[in-house]
């Protein structure tokens, strides 16, 4: 079951594309967090969505907001993906145990071994304030993210 608005966001600690551990709780009391689960690196829709975030990064990564993009790809895949596309935000690897964080958020497709396109806007106190889950083939609308962030 997907984490709902008003619930506390499950904490996690995952390696970023450089092998550094990143935890959700490290932002508590400091920044709102946008957690973006994506199915696979190097695929058309995922690349398009993350490039749109990259191109409008000041909205999603600033003194008040942290952007964390998560897939079940290996850390080394995330590193090459970030380098190729010029992503200057954390790409976190939910590779092992495979999809454990995506499962906590209710966005893991066990049959396909991937994270669905789940987005969670989490406030500074760790509460989910907005969420949407799309199918793997359906791109998300970044304008919705901006509206959700503006309401915090």
Predicted regions and their residues:
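Chalcogenol-based redox active-site neighborhoods
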Residues: 1-152
């Amino acid at each position: 079951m997907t984490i709902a608005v008003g619930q506390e966001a499950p904490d996690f600690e995952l390696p970023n594309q450089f092998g550094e551990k990143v935890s959700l709780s490290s932002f508590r009391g400091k920044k709102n967090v946008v957690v973006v689960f994506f199915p696979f690196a190097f695929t058309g829709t995922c690349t398009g969505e993350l490039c749109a975030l990259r191109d409008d990064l000041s909205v999603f990564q600033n003194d008040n907001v942290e952007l964390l993009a998560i897939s079940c790809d290996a850390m080394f895949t995330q590193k090459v993906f970030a380098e190729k596309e010029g992503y200057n935000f954390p790409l976190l690897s939910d590779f092992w145990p495979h999809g454990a964080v995506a499962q906590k958020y209710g966005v893991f497709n066990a049959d396909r071994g991937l994270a669905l396109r789940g987005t969670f806007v989490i406030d500074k106190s760790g509460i989910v304030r907005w969420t949407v889950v799309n199918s793997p083939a359906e791109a998300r609308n970044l304008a919705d993210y901006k509206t959700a962030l503006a309401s915090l």
